[in-house]
């Protein structure tokens, strides 16, 4: 599915780091990212270390890192790489980039801001405080961010303009409050979905479904992908008050897998656990898995 001539993420990151003027910073970033197998994530203590060592703010560091984040993009349709970095309440940085899939419908696409935010969500961040992106967020992403539990205070940084509130880009916004929904994306969930299993992949998918954000349809859905080396990556459904900017569970999981420096070609198994109240993501999930390499889907319906 990759569009890049430099296929491995390490090659793309090395090329991006070569463009950073501060060579010592570039070398430090190369070492840190290599040590963590090119996971697109910097814990708070690493962010603080870089800021202190190189006398910069975390906002300045995030702007420098945007080309590195964009290395994780798979722009197979647009040939246009977008990078984003979500800063969590913890102080950690979560990279994100656009993920596109040919030969299926364009609604399967993951935007860079969705990528960074869902990456943070899967790493159990509690709140997003800032997001840095190399291009102005599109309307789809503005609406997606409006679902966050930090929407009212979320700050957006662009190369040409920093410290703007989300609602500067989305005035008079329609959101969860219009539908009398108080629980937001990143708030804790308690769906109490239950299924007896000793299979760790099924349990991971069940846990992802129990974490899903679906206050409008009540279709709680989660997926787990197992790689050939037995690593497991979860994805939870992130629903949106405007419906169409919702992020399906498979996209969340694929994005998490890719942002951890892995390849979709290494997926061996997939399990979707779902309470299909008004919707179902089974068909859409099977369609995309077929494109990715005829990966069979185990589907488990719970209540």
Curated annotation (Swiss-Prot):
The keyword Hydrolase applies. Pfam families: dCMP_cyt_deam_1 (PF00383), dCMP_cyt_deam_2 (PF08211). The active site is at 113 (proton donor). Binds 1 zinc ion. Its EC number is 3.5.4.5. Residues 57-172, 196-303 form the CMP/dCMP-type deaminase domain. Homodimer. Belongs to the cytidine and deoxycytidylate deaminase family. This is Cytidine deaminase. It comes from Histophilus somni (strain 129Pt) (Haemophilus somnus). The lineage of its organism: Bacteria, Pseudomonadati, Pseudomonadota, Gammaproteobacteria, Pasteurellales. The gene is cdd.
